[in-house]
Amino acid sequence: MEGIKGSEVNVPDAVFAWLLDGKGGARHLEDNDVIDSEHPCWLHLNYTHPDSAQWLASTPLLPNNVRDALAGDSVRPRVSRLGDGTLITLRCINGSTDERPDQLVAMRLYMDERLIVSTRQRKVLALDDVVNDLKEGTGPADCGGWLVDVCDALTDHASEFIEELHDKIIDLEDNLLDQHIPPRGSLALLRKQLIVMRRYMTPQRDVYARLASERLSWMTDDQRRRMQDIADRLGRGLDEIDSCIARTAVMSDEIAQVMQESLSRRTYTMSLMAMVFLPSTFLTGLFGVNLGGIPGGGYQFGFSAFCIMLVVLIGGVAWWLHRSKWL
């Protein structure tokens, strides 16, 4: 394939444009550089920037049927071969476990043996690892190595996020053993994070597996084996997600049971209190009818005697409840 002039991929508002040196390093692309398979170019764009959007819509370096995908229309992870190039959509993890995971960060890329065009709207933190390796001279040497390193970084971030969720589940389980109910909504958020992760990471694992099995001309056999290892590692993470989802369901049932037991104890206590004071309530009501005068009303110590009788009656009922093992 013929080389590409650096001026053809010069986008003023690009996030960055790197020219790989084929030895693990990279430098900023210049207009007079020649892009070929030995020195591929990585162009990273924010498709919401006007110059980047204009370049994506007009450049002859991209097939017409990938322009919309790179401009943000593609959502779920997938891979499509288009002649000598490949269109790939990936999802990555940004942020912490306290954030809502409704929208994972999407990265779309089209690549062949000479050119890598990646687009995003929000920053992809996993790419910082690849950029740092290139700056230190320990990064990928070609397009195949670049793709493997990016997928490896994305999987590392996903694995770390899954491990954080797993640790939170262990903490919740320990608190439940001590009869401590988690704050309202925390378990629902955790479960939602797990479900959203599984929704997007399952097709992403399939993307990795397909990249490992496809005979792409710019990927070596060793890179395919590494890609298969990444797919297997993400698969183990998905198994961990399934386990965590099942554990959250068990915790939800346990929380409901703990709350029901707490309510039952309170109801039982109120019932015993009502049973203790029911005889005294009956007597005070009976003595207060006043149809024939209050019994003992003319006796000097009548009220005191009545109070003593109530105390004895309440004590007797309490003793009977204790003897019957109701208290």
Curated annotation (Swiss-Prot):
**GO CC, alphabetical:** plasma membrane
- Cellular localisation: Cell inner membrane
Under catalytic activity, the entry for this protein gives: Zn(2+)(out) + H(+)(out) = Zn(2+)(in) + H(+)(in)
Keyword terms of this UniProt record: Cell inner membrane, Cell membrane, Ion transport, Membrane, Transmembrane, Transmembrane helix, Transport, Zinc
Q: Which residues cross the membrane?
A: 274-294, 301-321
Q: Which ranges does the record list as Cytoplasmic topological domains?
A: 1-273, 322-327
Give the Pfam families listed for this entry: CorA
Topological domain ranges for the Periplasmic compartment = 295-300
Q: Which GO molecular-function terms appear in the entry? A: cobalt ion binding; cobalt ion transmembrane transporter activity; magnesium ion binding; magnesium ion transmembrane transporter activity; zinc ion transmembrane transporter activity
Decide whether keyword Glycoprotein is in the record: no
InterPro entries found in the cross-reference section: CorA_cytoplasmic_dom, CorA_TM1_TM2, MgTranspt_CorA/ZnTranspt_ZntB, Zn_transp_ZntB
Topology relative to the lipid bilayer, per the entry, is: Multi-pass membrane protein
Q: What family does the database annotate?
A: Belongs to the CorA metal ion transporter (MIT) (TC 1.A.35) family.
NCBIfam families, per database record: PRK09546.1
Query: What HAMAP family does the entry give?
Result: ZntB (MF_01565)
What does this protein's UniProt record list under function? Zinc transporter. Acts as a Zn(2+):proton symporter, which likely mediates zinc ion uptake.
Q: What is this protein called?
A: Zinc transport protein ZntB
Q: Which organism is it from?
A: Enterobacter sp. (strain 638)
